[in-house]
Regions:
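Active-site residues of response regulator receiver
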Residues: 54, 84
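Conserved acidic carboxylate
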Residues: 10
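Short hydrophobic/Thr-rich beta-strand motif most characteristic of the beta2 strand and flanking loop
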Residues: 27-34, 42
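Receiver (REC) domain active-site loop signature in two-component systems and cognate sites
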Residues: 57
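Acidic catalytic/metal-coordinating carboxylates
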Residues: 35-38, 61-67
Length: 124
């Protein structure tokens, strides 16, 4: 998995740092974005192998980011793992239709589990 490129989109700086550090220790290359607009800019600069995406962020929600990614052929197939505390049924239904690969609840987040799921998703 060494060198696989992950884009981490998370507005909470403490969680962002913890996830980034944990993933780097596993050998992943990690870019970070603090909101959806920055995430889309980073995707245009360098297509990641996987996106870890928060749903509730300033300026642009995770669902809006997903819609934008899925609307463009070059980004349509990028795997996305959601990190969120949102339990809204409407959000859950929409992210399923947008082809999200996995969903982790932040309140229950284990960095070990995050790393394991990222590894599994990237191994196919």
């Amino acid at each position: 998995m060494t060198g696989r490129h992950i884009l981490l989109v998370e507005d909470d700086r403490f969680l962002r740092r913890a996830c980034e550090t944990s993933l780097r220790q596993r050998g992943f290359s990690v870019a970070v974005a603090v909101d959806g607009e920055e995430a889309l800019d980073k995707v245009r600069q360098a297509r990641p192998d996987l996106i870890l995406l928060d749903l509730l962020m300033p300026r642009m929600t995770g669902i809006e980011v997903l819609r934008a990614l899925r609307a463009q052929e070059p980004t349509r197939g990028i795997p996305v793992l959601i990190l969120s505390n949102s339990s809204r049924a409407q959000d859950a239904e929409e992210i399923r239709t947008l082809g999200v690969c996995d969903y982790l609840v932040k309140a229950n987040l284990s960095l070990q589990e995050l790393g394991d799921r990222v590894t599994r998703l990237l191994e196919g």
